[in-house]
Amino acid sequence: MSSKVRVRFAPSPTGPLHIGGVRTALYNYLFAKKHGGDFVLRIEDTDQNRYVEGAEDYIIEALNWCGIPYDEGPGKEKGFGPYRQSERKDQYREYAEKLIKSGNAYYAFDTSDELDGHRKDHEEKGKTFIYNWHNRQKLKNSLSLSQEEVQEKLDGEEDYVIRFKSPQDETLHLKDVIRGDMEIDTNILDDKVLFKSDGMPTYHLANIVDDHLMEITHVIRGEEWLPSLALHYMLYRAFGWNAPQFAHLPLILKPQGKGKLSKRDGEKMGFPVFPLEWKDPESGDISAGYKEEGYFPEAVVNMLAFLGWNPGTEEEFFGLEDLTKAFELERVHKGGAKFDPEKTKWFQQHYIQLADNEFLADEFEKRLEKKEIEADKIYISEVVALIKERVVFVEDFWDQGYFFFIAPTSFDPKDSKKAWKEGTSELMTELNEYLKSIDNFEAEHLQETVKGWIKSKEIGFGKVMMPLRIALVGALQGPDLYKIAEFIGKEATLKRIQKAVDTLK
């Protein structure tokens, strides 16, 4: 076993990478980087019936978008490849045969129909059928049959599987970095299939062999694999290999807190559960992705890091570098972590505030070009700086600042009713005439002069400022009104006031 920390993320290419998988990859990445180790990507594609075209590319693209690229894996050979299990399948039989020779595994010739019959018989008696020490001598396998019968079946190309021979009357002492010490009675374990009748290994065998050959020192994976921990420990022991350290991560739960977060939850409640958009190659259905929904990868990574872990302080905003320094497996929670879509938006809003204005202006300019709106880059940057604190996504810049680029095409009915009263049109006409006489349209000067004009009229500020906002914006929203007037300029300001008077009189 290598003294250097080596971890692996080993997804199956059966569809898009769920954010639960991204979190597993993230924790592996953080642990490896903290300890100066390697983060390995291995594609576990032994189940060819479930293989989905494009899924592997999606996984790699998703990791890169999140800023957690692998050090070693497909396309990044480092001497431990191949990194797709389908390309390693020839070696698995060799290891399965070693287990048979050492007495730790055996051939089983029971057909699916025969096993279904045994299950049915047990169910009728109120029992559960388990293929293990209790009944393996009564079943059709190389432990119950003579050597001649076994050889005859093998020579006759009869279908068979290879099963692990679980020990009887033993207490296994297991250790998990997150969950501590555990004990398992081997009498309750079944003899798991290690090699299938189609000539492909199961996850259990391929996983253990690959982890050993790739010198993986720490296996950090989801808690759904916790029931397999005993088998995996026994496999390491059967091969005479040192086992890596194991850490089983808690589930990501639905927002309500009950059950594992699923794709359906996202569809029903309107939030993504995938890092990138995914188009199903068969149905053509499109599932939303965080990237396409406008989230920054920094926000998604920060959110995922806190789904099951915390640094032990009040601080919640961590970039990748800070996460790497702070991350400890021992601080990962045992219990499930409830997913909160609003918390994700909260992280996103934080990171958009930190984003460089020039970058945001470039992104906003792309949106403006789609709307066939031309604007000076400096002007766009100034608008971005003014309304930045009001947005969560880049797309929000238009909703929060469209009036900097086009005049309102309509006026919000509810807001207009609230702001435009009897006599308002006459008052706004007077204001328009007054503004024509002002040459300096800078916000600070405008504020001083307009306030003076309102005071001279002996009326409340709301009677002028609310309808003025309706005229310039189209609704009772937006940043400082004098800034809006300064940005759009004197001519546009006068035109908008006149249009409001003509429309709302």
Swiss-Prot record:
Protein's UniProt keywords contain ATP-binding: yes
Major location (coarse): cytoplasm
Annotated protein name in UniProt: Glutamate--tRNA ligase
Keywords attached to this entry: Aminoacyl-tRNA synthetase, ATP-binding, Cytoplasm, Ligase, Nucleotide-binding, Protein biosynthesis
Location within or outside the cell: Cytoplasm
Motif 'HIGH' region per UniProt: ranges: 11-21
A cellular component term, taken from the record's GO annotations: cytosol
NCBIfam families hit by this protein: gltX_bact
Subunit organization: Monomer.
Annotated gene: gltX
GO BP, sorted A to Z: glutamyl-tRNA aminoacylation
